[in-house]
UniProtKB/Swiss-Prot annotation:
InterPro entries: EF-G-like_DII, EFG_II, EFG_III, EFG_III/V, EFG_IV, EFG_V, EFG_V-like, G_TR_CS. GO terms for cellular component: cytoplasm. One of its GO terms (biological process) is ribosome disassembly. It comes from Thermotoga sp. (strain RQ2). The gene is fusA. This is Elongation factor G. GO terms for molecular function: GTP binding; GTPase activity; translation elongation factor activity. Keywords: Cytoplasm, Elongation factor, GTP-binding, Nucleotide-binding, Protein biosynthesis.
Amino acid sequence: MENVEARYVDLDKLRNIGIMAHIDAGKTTTTERILYYTGRKHFLGDVDEGNTTTDWMPQEKERGITIQSAATTCFWKGYRINIIDTPGHVDFTAEVERALRVLDGAIAVFDATAGVEPQSETVWRQADKYNVPRIAFMNKMDKVGADFYMAVETLVTKLKANPIPVQMPIGSEKDFQGVIDLIKMKAIYWVSEDGSVYEERDIPEELREEAEMRREEMLEKVAELDEEILEKYLEGEEISEEEIKRILRKATIENRAVPVLCGAAKANKGIQPLLDAVIDYLPSPLDLPPVKGWRVSDGEIVYRKPDENEPFTALVFKVQVDPYIGKLVYFRVYSGRLEKGSYVYNSTKGQRERISRIVFMHADKREEVDYVRPGDIAAGVGLKVSQTGDTLCDEKEPVILEKIDFPEPVISLAIEPATKADEEKLVKALLALSEEDPTLQVRVDKETGETIISGMGELHLEIVVDRLKREFGVNVRVGQPQVAYRETIKRPAEAEGKYIRQTGGRGQYGHVILRIEPIPEEEGKNFEFIDKTVGGVIPKEFMPAIEAGIKEAMMSGPLAGYPVVRVRAVVLDGSYHEVDSSEMAFKIAASMAFKEAMKKAQPVLLEPIMKLEITTPEEYMGNIISDLNSRRAKIESLETRGHLKIVVAKIPLSETFGYATVLRSLSQGRASYIMQFSHYQEVPEKIAEKIIKVV
């Protein structure tokens, strides 16, 4: 175990990285091996055995997929590396989004037999959104069908990246033995069974020619990144190892290049050079621009540098409920210093909190520390109100960092306790789970009294139900999955709402004239409120009540009671009574006017459309496509990847329930698919009639 002081390395020796990948590219195994070789693990975890460190929730151990991003810290050659494990399954994109917000760099892991797969495209685009510098690791080089250069080429064709291989594999499939370092021009072989002993040797004669050609290709790409080096290169001068690394590092941090390495994590080959590459090419907190925030007092933009003397600023990126110490709030420190036992200000909530303990996490073990500094990723105990996306800062100089956006849920399930004893436990458990996961929404249906949970996909909700049983001991019954339909309007309409009550004593008086109009989808807004009244016909202090009345009415549309979206509400006119007018009266009048206007505005039903990507052997493609056509799907593209076909389609969510079973029988279990939300679109009239009838 390192001594405490070693933990606080200089900032330039700190790396905050994520490991991102398609669901089966071997990300968890890669993380495991990193922890093993950096000395934090004493046995080799194997996902198939279910004893890995970062996959520590029982569901993950069973399913072999990573759901919760656990933050882990380890050391390599005097550098400290904080790793945030991100899930590769599409139902968990919220976890990926929040992990990417707080990372400085990432390792993108690919399966060398497939290269870029559909989910890796999604994660890559999310990383682009946050400008995260990346290096790529072509894993599974020992698998049948592994082809390093084909896999590298997919980075260009599918991701428009600029990959620069800095290694070349020695053999592939069962003959994969090691790698050639094209910068040092040395061959690296792994000698011991567990891969902890490796040695550099001269490049074997039979590979020398190819290695020189590959080095030349690398140098050419490196030279294109820097004017000075380009001149040297064109004049045939020697370019040193240091220069190559310096240029590659700069270009990686600026997102102009992606160094590519290869290996086979499960066979314990290729991990140590990957760790060296994390240090060589990925940024420390000092290499990145200061974090941007908004001053609470006046909304001015301020920047916080990664410096202990700056005011404290941190972003909460995860909340977990730990069975032993309660609520753990994970945060990334951008500036300043925070001691345990001190007060911190949550500027998002406008509340002051005391952080009683600070812990560094090693997957599911934890070590307590006295303070945190810039660049640290830690978890705090004692923060009651803090949630994902909140800013924690110095009370004297409060700022707000930009919030993390999460997508709206698209699928719902009714859920009820199996017995009376489960009733109270269910409420508590759902509260804890929705606090951890911002894409899980919980509500009670006013009419039926049922508890409804909503999320990002079937798997997402299955796992929630599973966790209720295992972690919280709550037995539940669940209904059929329901689509989260929405309602909107196709044309503007006006209406008036008048609420007048005259009973003994003070009456009630509210009067509102409204226009509602559709908001085009591309504006990306679900609601906008505009006050166009003039001459004080309605005093300004009633406007918030009018807006609240409209929002309440929007929760249940006129067609089938689904939430209303993409509507702009404009208050045109109205009147008030000096004595009888109240917020309550205006809220009711606005709600009446809105409901009336909705009826005239040609309301329509919207349904979630999913992007579906199916990977299948060619012989099943005909059956799969004709089945898709029967499900109202639109085929967008057909691609060939090796001996497999990739079908990309847009399909209504309502047509996909139980699709896993259907696809299994259509392809004898050989096809796989991933699905994610794309957009909302109008439901065809005949189908809308059926949905409305059921309601």
